């Protein structure tokens, strides 16, 4: 055990940058957060300014240490967790990005993916070697788009002048004064360029997409010292950066789901269900991803993942675009003012459908509207859609793995909504466990960093600190459960291939 007092987790998310300080008992001492701008150049396109990502992340770190009067020599290590797949390409010499960060939600490369699907055997090769599906969601086609569309980028890349990184790589490179170009297995596994069998960059895929190997970062485990940073505050001590994991894998680790068959769902902007499958690579036949997660010591292990693109973002849509809510937190109050959704289903496929459908051309739909439907029914149906989408993924996961979950661990902003959690339990017919500490993603990053530097000796030491705040048990009528879910499946069919079939109608 070290005599340092604190661990810091940096959580660079889709809408905000956060810093979380933990003490040796894994208690949260303080949290600091700054939001940043979402950029929408065209319909279906989503970008961030990479310099703003770094500026907000470094600002919250400096801010939180100053606020708590904590010196850098009191920090044992920093762990980083980040929005995954989001793609940044920058100049190795100047450090300036050649284009905005293309965000995981961005669908601009759908046509590139369609063209690649014409290559015989390529989809199967990608599935077998990266564990992913050929979809705009992942980094590979985003890098290709930048190299193909930014003037001079392809030439500079071929000359070895450009670097690629997911957000973790960009932050570490900046925080170490441009000395360390590194990523971890969990983030690498989300690029569609990393071979999860050999644990190396896949040179065949790099060649197909026209991406030079020189752009790619060194790939390491999720729990080791990658470099040092002097950003943070007074004390004069450089702080080790000792943990990196993509946000969903960090949450899985924060829940201590490190053994085969343990699973969690994170309800954030999107919803992400992960099940650890240990050393066994399970290839999905139900539209799920095979990805890399963290074993007990931060080493690479395998997991199944299902991604729902619109989770909490659908509630933001009710608030910001539909003006049905003043505050997202009010959704529970209005949803419980009615006894049911009155036959209404909302399918929030605003940017396509993720697992298990993988339809980039699906678009959002409200079905079952009658004269008796009011705003409360639509709010309730939107909340219910989050639970139904989770059921879609969990059914596929259990079919692939052969494991029936006894309980689902949950985290993320929406888990504070008791209506949603109870409905989730009812829809799944499974126990839902909500932990006392909501910052599970930050916990995972902190645990990985702390274990790397000896701040904590083992996961067993941490296990006693985990507390379940509330357990939700299913109590829905089995016949009604089946009927409701059948209605959901019919509603999903109404959304599929909409943009592909109807785009010309809007020209």
Swiss-Prot record:
Entry binding sites for ATP: 14-16, 269, 312, 316, 413
EC number from the UniProt entry: 2.7.1.30
Binding site for glycerol: 84-85, 137, 247-248
InterPro entries: ATPase_NBD (IPR043129), Carb_kinase_FGGY (IPR000577), Carb_kinase_FGGY_CS (IPR018483), FGGY_C (IPR018485), FGGY_N (IPR018484), Glycerol_kin (IPR005999)
Binding-site list for ADP: 14, 18, 269, 312, 413, 417
Catalytic activity, as annotated: glycerol + ATP = sn-glycerol 3-phosphate + ADP + H(+)
Pathway annotation: Polyol metabolism; glycerol degradation via glycerol kinase pathway; sn-glycerol 3-phosphate from glycerol: step 1/1
Function noted in UniProt: Key enzyme in the regulation of glycerol uptake and metabolism. Catalyzes the phosphorylation of glycerol to yield sn-glycerol 3-phosphate.
Similarity remark: Belongs to the FGGY kinase family.
Protein known as: Glycerol kinase
């Amino acid at each position: 055990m070290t005599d340092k007092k604190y661990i810091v987790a940096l959580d660079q998310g889709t809408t905000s940058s956060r810093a979380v300080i933990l003490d040796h008992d894994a208690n949260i001492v303080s949290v600091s957060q700054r939001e940043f701008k979402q950029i929408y150049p065209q319909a279906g396109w989503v970008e961030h300014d990479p310099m703003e990502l770094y500026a907000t992340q470094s600002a919250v770190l400096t801010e939180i240490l100053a606020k708590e009067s904590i010196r850098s020599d009191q920090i044992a290590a920093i762990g980083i967790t980040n929005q995954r797949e989001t793609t940044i390409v920058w100049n190795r010499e100047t450090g300036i990005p050649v284009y905005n960060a293309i965000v995981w939600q961005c669908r601009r490369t759908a046509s590139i993916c369609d063209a690649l699907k014409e290559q015989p055997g390529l989809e199967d090769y990608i599935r077998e070697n990266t564990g992913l599906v050929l979809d705009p969601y992942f980094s590979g086609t985003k890098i290709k788009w930048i190299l193909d569309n930014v003037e001079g980028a392809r030439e500079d890349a071929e000359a070895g002048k450009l670097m690629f990184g997911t957000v973790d790589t960009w932050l570490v490179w900046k925080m170490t004064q441009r000395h360390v170009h590194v990523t971890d297995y969990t983030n690498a596994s989300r690029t569609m360029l990393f071979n999860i069998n050999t644990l190396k960059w896949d040179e065949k895929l790099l060649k197909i997409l026209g991406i030079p190997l020189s752009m790619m970062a060194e790939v390491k485990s999720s729990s080791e010292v990658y470099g040092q940073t002097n950003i943070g505050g007074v004390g004069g001590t450089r702080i080790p950066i000792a943990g990196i994991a993509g946000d969903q894998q960090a949450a899985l680790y924060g829940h201590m789901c490190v053994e085969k068959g343990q699973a969690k769902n994170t309800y954030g902007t999107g919803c992400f269900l992960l099940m650890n499958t240990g050393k066994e690579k399970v290839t999905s036949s139900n539209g799920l991803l095979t990805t890399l997660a963290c074993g007990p010591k931060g080493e690479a292990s395998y997991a199944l993942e299902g991604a729902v693109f619109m989770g909490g973002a659908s509630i933001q849509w009710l608030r910001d675009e539909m003006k049905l809510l003043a505050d997202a937190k009010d959704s529970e109050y209005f949803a419980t003012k009615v006894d049911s959704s009155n036959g209404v289903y909302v399918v929030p496929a605003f940017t396509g459908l993720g697992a298990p459908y993988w339809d980039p051309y699906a678009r959002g739909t409200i079905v079952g509207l009658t004269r008796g439907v009011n705003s409360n029914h639509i709010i309730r149906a939107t909340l219910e859609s989050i639970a139904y989408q989770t059921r879609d993924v969990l059914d596929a996961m259990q079919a692939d793995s052969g494991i029936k979950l006894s309980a689902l661990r949950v985290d993320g902003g929406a888990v504070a909504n008791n209506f949603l959690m109870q409905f989730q339990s009812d829809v799944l017919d499974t126990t839902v466990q909500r932990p006392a500490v909501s910052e599970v993603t930050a916990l995972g990053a902190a645990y990985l960093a702390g274990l790397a530097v000896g701040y904590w000796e083992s996961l067993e030491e941490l296990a006693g600190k985990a507390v379940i705040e509330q357990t939700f048990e299913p109590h829905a009528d089995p016949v009604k459960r089946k009927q409701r879910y059948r209605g959901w499946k019919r509603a999903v069919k109404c959304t599929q291939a909409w943009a592909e079939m109807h785009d010309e109608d809007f020209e």
